[in-house]
């Protein structure tokens, strides 16, 4: 059996889909469906069972035996970079992750989890090293602190010559693609621009030359499953390694629709200083781990995404 936390969410449900494509259906999806709109992500998927996140945490903490677990893909988190309730964020993203990690260590279960490029904050170097990690918001801090916790676990195990199961964290950069529609304001810029053009408006982008490392969801799933297949541990950047501008996203959306144009709007005051204006994954460690596949460009990924959204 596989367990996917956040399995009704964007990345989680996409991993479930990728497992289904391998013929794997013995999957326990864990999520919080208080936002009932997320159920849409599960409609076309084959799963064995669904469990509410709070019930799952209770069972994990009490040491419940779930039977033979091949791996846990831990994608469940509060991913809103605009959320400033630190207590809520640390409970959701840090304490929950620690409980799951120890459950996996005690039972020798591979643990593949979602970290984030938000751990780097306003840096212009995006390499998996402490000196480059300075998060700008409490979401990034919660992810950073769990990465630090994992590093201490590795150090402690090495000092005592202990063997650990696979533990791998992926620092997701700007992921976009199918199954993110429930995220509202946190959905990708491509999603919002598509809605604007379908409403007869122009594609509105903030002023400035902001560039991000936009990575297509299909590539994110491929990396997750490659690491599971190859039993490699570590913390790795998961982006394309190539920053592209929001303008290029806008142009790709306009090119698909063959109408409208990119329109510039003022950058919101409340986001200044709390917003990464540039991200670009350093893929040195990912490539050294053995992952060789290429990543879709913004033009390629956006075209595929637009075809899915407007199907």
From Swiss-Prot:
CDD domains: ADP_GME_SDR_e. Pathway: Nucleotide-sugar biosynthesis; ADP-L-glycero-beta-D-manno-heptose biosynthesis; ADP-L-glycero-beta-D-manno-heptose from D-glycero-beta-D-manno-heptose 7-phosphate: step 4/4. InterPro entries: Epimerase_deHydtase, Heptose_epim, NAD(P)-bd_dom_sf. Binds 1 NADP(+) per subunit. NADP(+) binds at residues 10-11, 31-32, 38, 53, 75-79, 92, 143, 175, 183. The active site is at residues 139, 183. Belongs to the NAD(P)-dependent epimerase/dehydratase family. HldD subfamily. This is ADP-L-glycero-D-manno-heptose-6-epimerase. It comes from Psychromonas ingrahamii (strain DSM 17664 / CCUG 51855 / 37). The gene is hldD.
């Amino acid at each position: 059996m596989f367990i996917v936390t956040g399995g009704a969410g964007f990345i989680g449900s996409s991993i479930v889909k990728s497992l289904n494509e391998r013929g794997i259906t013995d999957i326990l999806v864990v999520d919080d469906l208080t936002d009932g709109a997320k159920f849409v992500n599960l409609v076309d998927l084959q799963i064995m069972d669904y469990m509410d996140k709070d019930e799952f945490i209770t069972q994990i903490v009490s040491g419940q035996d779930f039977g033979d677990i091949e791996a846990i893909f831990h994608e469940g988190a509060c991913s809103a970079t605009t959320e400033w309730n630190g207590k809520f964020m640390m409970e959701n993203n840090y304490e929950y992750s620690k409980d799951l990690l120890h459950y996996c260590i005690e039972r020798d279960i591979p643990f593949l989890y979602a970290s984030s490029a938000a751990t780097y904050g306003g840096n212009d170097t995006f390499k998996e090293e402490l000196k480059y990690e300075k998060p700008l918001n409490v979401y990034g801090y919660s992810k950073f602190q769990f990465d630090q916790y994992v590093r201490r676990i590795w150090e402690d195990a090495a000092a005592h010559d202990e063997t650990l199961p696979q533990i791998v964290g992926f620092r997701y950069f700007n992921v976009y693609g199918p199954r993110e529609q429930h995220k509202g304001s946190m959905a990708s810029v491509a999603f919002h621009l598509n809605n604007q053009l379908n409403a007869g408006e122009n594609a509105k982008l903030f002023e400035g030359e902001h560039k991000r490392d936009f990575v297509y969801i299909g590539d994110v799933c491929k990396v997750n499953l490659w690491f599971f297949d190859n039993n490699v541990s570590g913390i790795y950047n998961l982006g394309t390694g190539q920053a592209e501008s929001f303008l290029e996203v806008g142009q790709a959306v306009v090119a698909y629709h063959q109408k409208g144009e990119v329109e510039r709007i003022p950058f919101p005051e409340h986001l200044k200083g709390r917003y990464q204006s540039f991200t670009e994954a350093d893929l040195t460690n990912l490539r050294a781990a053995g992952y060789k596949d290429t990543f879709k460009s913004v033009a390629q990924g956006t075209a595929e995404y637009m075809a899915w959204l407007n199907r």
